[in-house]
Amino acid sequence: MNVPVDKSSPSRPRRLADVGRWDMETDVAIIGFGGSGAAAAIEASDQGAAVTIFDLASASGGSTALSSAEIYMGGNGGTRVQRACGLEDSTEDMYQYLMAANGPLADPDKVRAYCEGSLDHFNWLVGLGVPYKDTLYNQRAIMALTDDCLLYTGSEKAWPYNRVAKPCPRGHNLQVEGDNGGPLFMKIMTENVEKRGVKVVFEARALTLIVDDERRVHGVVVRIDQQERCVRARRGVILCAGGFAMNQEMLRKYSPLLLAASEPIGNPGDTGSGIQMGMAVGAAAINMHEGFVSLPYYPPSSLTWGILVNAQGQRFVNEDCYHGRVGYYCLQQPDRRVYLIANVEDFGDYEKTSYLGAKFVATAEESVAELESELQLPEGTLQNTIEVFNRNAAEGVDPLFHKTAEWLKPLELPLAALDCTPGHGAFYPFFTLGGLDTLPSGEVLTAARTVIQGLYAAGRTACGVPRTASGYASGIS
């Protein structure tokens, strides 16, 4: 009889008393060789520790290698790139923005540490050889496909955040053309790991932690060549094994809303194994219901002049904010029906440049009522929405949703609509934001917020600075 495996439950830890012998020993054992694992290995090695990385893949990279590797940095007067572009960025503005963006779930200590250490973070990366060009990509875009560095990767210029802190671009892209930042970043990080003589074991699956009766972590059980090996970690285990976007059972259990999105962002190893290993020894997993969800409705940026409406023909968000914030609110709508309506001319080269994939489902040349009927919206609703929007847009204001004047103009016939309803073809990529509760210095915490000795977590295995898609900015996880 085959007993189904519950892939949403923690693994049972191995008791220290049951370990007959150690197959391997190291000072620091790191689980996962993506961006966070590489950074942890470099830092630990530079502090004099013997470090061993275990990764289930056959090469380094993780989800970082699949990303654009934008990193959100600033404050302290500005990074070298910000200053070269004539920008001054205060730590307090950066802090206030991130606190507001993460709302009531924000961790003030983590946000403060992130902002105050951001300039050092930038300089550390530059010291490792990560290239950043001293240029600004001053366009509304999801990523810079040129080798320019600096761009807005959040909702800093949009309501309500533009009323909280002075906007400043903080997304830093590597000096490489195309969407190739992730591979280059991991190449550089891997070279730095190798240069330090860090031991790396690939095709090694971490199974469970080894703990004593006081729940102190002493090591980890790893499967290598189909054999279980007990690894002693004299100074600690660091879990850098990613999130759980690839684990359907964990998504159903903790974050079912994300199942409405279309495609997980990550690598096959993002199964939540690191989170489960931590939970098994008493770690608190927090914010597990939250995830990043994107609706990449720009480029072309001209679609920002359009409006997004729901099944009631009503707007629900200021369309000039970050695509992640829009994606979050799209999933909250009645029946999740969402349409993007814009002047025909503003669709521009949509079919060539867009990532969205949404289909045209209605056009109107004679009247808004015609479009309303084609979209099967309640009679009069869309007509009223557009009439109110146009009246205010003509005056450069949006009292309902506070879209900035830069992106306000009346909607004029002919109009067209894209079906952005989840499940109808529109691209809704997602990843998870929940993870193990940690101190800003990485120590894993219990539900009572006591430290589990010998256990640390980073990357998406930990619940870090970002806490909600509604305020997410690319480059903070």
Model-derived features with residue positions:
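An anion/pyrophosphate-binding glycine-rich loop and adjacent beta-alpha core
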Residues: T271, I275-M277, V281-T381
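A glycine-rich dinucleotide-binding beta-alpha-beta segment and adjacent secondary-structure elements
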Residues: P4, T208, R216, T381-A469
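Extreme N-terminal leader/targeting segments of oxidoreductases
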Residues: M1-V28
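Conserved redox-cofactor binding core of oxidoreductases
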Residues: V3, A113-Q227, Q248-E249, A393-L418
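N-terminal Rossmann-like FAD-binding beta1-loop-alpha1 element of flavoenzymes
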Residues: V28-I53
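Glycine-rich FAD pyrophosphate-binding loop
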Residues: D46-L66
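Glycine-rich loop(s) and the adjacent beta-strand/alpha-helix scaffold that form part
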Residues: N180, D225-P296, I476
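Glycine-rich active-site loop/strand segments that organize a redox cofactor
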Residues: Y72-Y114
